[in-house]
Amino acid sequence: MRRVLSILLLLVAIASSRAGTHDGNDVVLLGDSNTWLGGDSCDNRRGWSWWFCSCYHPATCVSYARSGATWTNTPSTVRDITGYSETISDNNVIYNQIYRLVDAVRTGVQPIPELVVVMAGTNDAWFCTKRPYALSETADEAFSRTLPACASEAVTLASSVRLACDILMRELPSSRIVLITPMQSVSAGADAIAAVSAIIADCGQRIGLPVIRLDTDGCVKADMERRHRTYTYDGNHTNTEGARCIGEYIARAIDNISDK
């Protein structure tokens, strides 16, 4: 009897330890500097991606994120899968990260991801002079128009999110997509982050994609960071503790989405 009980307890322990593991799942991350901090292989603890992997346990996790990236395109944005930039520029956009991913899948470099996570929006809010049309259109207005044919025709945040997600869903129809709003930022300002996040959330709802709201539910609070750096090193980018907090939160949130 004791032996049977011991075996049962062992099985329960094994099952518990496997909870939240996704050994067969390939994951891809798109985004800006806070995702880029974790490195392309998600092996740097300064980025939330390392902590996400340690909690979510995917088979693979590859980041296509770039520092300075925005959702919002410009009239000069063109498809570019070879250029590299760590600052805000016409082609440093989620649109081109998606096409780099698509090219990697087509050439066999990247397995078809089971999950694609897009966390961006800070730079759209922060560098409004570089993306002057970003907040000039609501999600309702963007979706009332014909889908833009190319990036240079999608120069608002809402139209850029719509176009990018349409490409992702068309090119990777079997992949789950999760959108994440930017965390709060001292430099970007509360109003701008809130406006950007609301548009991303509205677009996600329109498309039918789940959205995780870091701006409201994340551990980084701009007022707190302004007084004392707790989860960031500069008020905008995570330190190791902030990366841990956000990465583990995102892993749990995605698990909760999967369970529904």
Residue ranges of each PLM-predicted region?
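Solvent-exposed loop/turn segments at secondary-structure junctions
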Residues: 33-37, 66-72, 121-127, 183-187, ...
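Catalytic His-Asp segment of secreted/periplasmic serine-dependent ester chemistry enzymes
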Residues: 40, 79, 182-260
